[in-house]
Amino acid sequence: MAVGHYDLKRTKNKQYYFNLKASNGEVILTSEMYTTKAAANKGIRSVQANSPAEKNFEIRENKSGKSYFVLKARNYQVIGISESYDNEVAVKKGIQSAIKHGSSVNVRDLTKSE
């Protein structure tokens, strides 16, 4: 069975973030920026803990009218944001993918190669 994974990355200005990726390599959601690697890893653990419950997802609409979803922690803080989708069916499929792959413990630390 193929599983998703997390890619932990660092920006040029030394901020950390992660992407949750599906087994096919597509980005499901992206985190906020973190000032430390430890904080980004804590964010990954929060996604792992909160993604199995559909109630933690919220569908929103951006300024151009496209749908996207956010994943919220128990304290209602947004811990991940999806890409934009053309319709509600597609955004719901994205949520199901996040539920399926979010509990993955496979974290690829791409900051080591920088």
From Swiss-Prot:
InterPro entries: DUF1508, UPF0339_domain, YegP-like_sf. Disulfide bonds: none annotated. Sequence repeats lie at residues 11-59, 62-110. Pfam families: DUF1508. Keywords: Repeat. It comes from the Bacteria. Gene3D superfamilies: 2.30.29.80. PANTHER family: PTHR40606, UPF0339 PROTEIN YEGP. Belongs to the UPF0339 family. Duplicated subfamily. This is UPF0339 protein plu2779.
